[in-house]
Every structure is written in C-alpha cells, then in structure tokens.
Amino acid sequence: MGTSKAGLAWHGSTLLRRTVGVVARGVAGPVVVVRAPGQPLPQLPVDVEVRDDDHEGLGPLQGLSVGLHALNGVADVAFCCSTDMPFLHTAFVARVVQAMDDDYDVVLPVARGHRQPLAAAYRPALAADIDDLLAAGQLKPAFLFDRCRVLRLTDDALLADRALAASDPTLESLVNVNEPADYQQAQARPAPAVQVECFGVLARNGHRGARTVRAATISSAAQAAELVFDHHVVAAVNGDQVTRDGSTPLVAGDTVTFVSADAGG
C-alpha cells in the first residue's frame, strides 16, 4: 500500500477506528491493537489497549502472539483480524466467535476461496504454542493449525447463521484492501444503509418516523438525518449500545436511535 493502513481515511473515520469498533461490538469484550513500536495510530476509544510488537518482520504469528498474550486470562476466545477489512460486519465477528466450543482451539473460516487466519477466533492460551513455533522459525499459521484443534467454517457453514446471511450474504467481511486500487474501489462504494429514528424533543422537531440513510458512523448518520449530534443528544445502536461517541462505526442493517439527553428521552 505504501503507507500505514491503520490511518487510511474511511467515510469520515479511519480503517483502524472502524475495525476496532466493529470488533468491539461483535465480541462484547476487551479490544487489543498490536502495532510496530512507535507506530502512530489514529484516535481510538480510551478502553482500547495498545501493545507494541517488538519483533517486526516475523509475520502474522508474531502479532497473534502479542495480542493473545494480552488477552490470556482475560478472555476465553479472541477474534483476531487485520485492520484492512473495510466491510467487516459485526455479525461475522459474532458468528466466528460463537462457533468456538470446548472441542476446539481455533475457529478458522475457509471462505471466498482461501483460509482466513486473520479473520479467525483463537484461544488466548495458544500464545505459548505460537512462541514455540516462532523460536523454531516456523512462521506460518499453518504450523499452528497442525498442532491444535481447528474448526474450519466454509462459506455455507458461516452463512448457516441467519444474522450473517441476512447482513453479509456474500461474505464481504473478508475483503481486504492490499493495493491502492483496492482501497480506491472500496472507498468508491456507498456507506452502509442504516435506519435512523428520533424520539423525544428531536421527534417533535420535525424528525418523526424512521428513515434509511447511508452512514458509516453515528456522526454521519446524524448529519444525513439533518440532526446536530452534540452534547444534548445521545445515540443508541440497535437499542442496546448508548453512546455520545460520534466515531462509533455502523454496519449494514443497524438502527440508530437519537434521543435528546436533556429531555431524558
């Protein structure tokens, strides 16, 4: 790409901010970002933990090791992905994580014609196994899969989940932007279609009824609905995530409810 993908612009936000927010919604748990030492990052939510990878050039297993060590003892399952997946959907993250059970150590999508080790779920305890592989110079994820229990999910198996089939029927969650042309093509596509609703004072001010808008963040949804998203307004995503953070990413099918905070709804 020629530049860090983390800070690439994405519909008024950045690729990393979007990825962090989508993963957080899909796992309902802590989020860890692994970066090169000193790598500048775009603004992230305060509860996101940033860990430095002090051993660059060892490939994806090294990054996995750092992230899994951070979550070992904190989470039972970790969804691990790259930052360059602009169409990643919360339903995809949830589908992969929820497929993990006591019989497996890894849930590996084998979809869109490829294994997807950077869109997969791992047991954090695998960090020690990965360290052994790195020490032996075995740097490919395939070496890890050879020594642990892997549940492989095909396209059909992934889409057996109704929520994912409805939200992302072609599994575009797995699309990467590896080249400048990929990024330009992705940027040219419209933002996700979401529903916007207003209640309380906002509804009485001429914004009554649900409407469909194109928006990748809460702020852009408010703008599309001709609302001023300031400290007087709160937003709820799908009725359960209440926030004043306008950078919160949205995905196709979301419903955003805006309420006047001063009026208490």
Residue ranges and their predicted role:
Residues 1-138, 146-171, 260, 264:
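Nucleotide and nucleotide-moiety/phosphate-recognizing core
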Residues 5, 172, 206-210:
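Short, solvent-exposed beta-strand edge segments and adjacent coil->beta transition regions
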Residues 94, 128, 142, 183-184, ...:
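Generic structural signal for individual residues within well-ordered alpha-helical segments
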Residues 124, 180, 239:
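Residues immediately flanking
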Residues 137-140, 198:
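Core catalytic alpha/beta fold that binds nucleotide/phospho-ligands
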Residues 157-192:
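Glycine-rich phosphate/pyrophosphate-binding loop and the adjoining helix
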Residues 184-264:
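Ubiquitin-like/PB1-type beta-grasp interaction modules and other compact soluble beta-rich domains
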